[in-house]
Amino acid sequence: MKKILSFLLATVILLPCFSGCAESLLPKEVPEDFSFALTWGVYGISSYDSRTGKLVKTKDATNPADYVTYVKLSDEVMELIYKKLRALNVESYPDEYDPDPMMGSDPSADLILTIRNGDRVKTVTAKDVSLSYDALFPKGKRFIDTCLDISDILTDTEEWKALPDYEFYYD
């Protein structure tokens, strides 16, 4: 009986730790092998991958290669983005996410956020997001705002500004 009680007590004490003490994808300090990728915009025409530095302004162009550049973000910018992603708690989002299932628009935006830490990867895909970037709940608004904050950082780089203007605009 003592063994059973000891086992139950140990289970009650340790079970929460096993379910909640797993190492976070984004620990407090920026991991050496942290990287992220973001796809954003109308139909997901723009993208950036910090692993390769590839920054794409648009894939909808006569010559898409003209709209591609490479940018290595500074350690300070990477740390700023890391803090935004950590505050988002990306692990709490499902792989397929709709920030506002009650809202839609045509055209619509895609937001695809991938975070890598070594061999651990988490991707959250939000397709057909209303271009008003509204969300039904605060969690959805946090996801949208984080993605837009990161895209603002990327579109503020000199490399982005040096790319040609869009050929096509969506009505």
Model-predicted segments: where are they?
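Charged, amphipathic alpha-helical segments
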Residues: 23, 74-102
